[in-house]
């Protein structure tokens, strides 16, 4: 079912209020939507620009983070990553464990050159995007998780994958959307990414395959019915 983007954005803003960050869509293409600029280190800080309304495009030449290139589908996984994650960052007990964890991500290099990020409300109609990323405080997460579980009885309808900020959100969404899956993800627990985001925010990620379903039911959920969510919404949007 195709998403009525304008209606979804309207419903989202009504449900969460003006202080909640709007969803960021992302997709690959052969043509950038903005001039790519070189970024050293993590590219996650540029998502703050996207949140503010600016489109961003990156390719393998402008994204210098080896892991970021890989998890965004712009280049193969660098050979040093498993050892680096284990022996330098100490996030896994061994390089073999890192390799095993990464194997579950089924990483593929996109045939397209660029990865693009743009706020959903500003994106052109007809773009085949992978899903959305939402910067979320604990209160906003409460609403997003409640929304995601509304029509899904699975205990892992919302998952917290191990990995870097981009692997646990961007790569997870790409793969889930390819599988036409129903799982959403919470990311940005990785200590390496934390200094690059607001201290009271994580990232909620929804594949388009799931967003199409969630958009249909949003007005039936607690976000529009009952009194509990309204108290949380008021705290997100104080007078």
Segment roles from a protein language model:
Residues 3-239:
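Acidic, serine/proline-rich low-complexity intrinsically disordered regions
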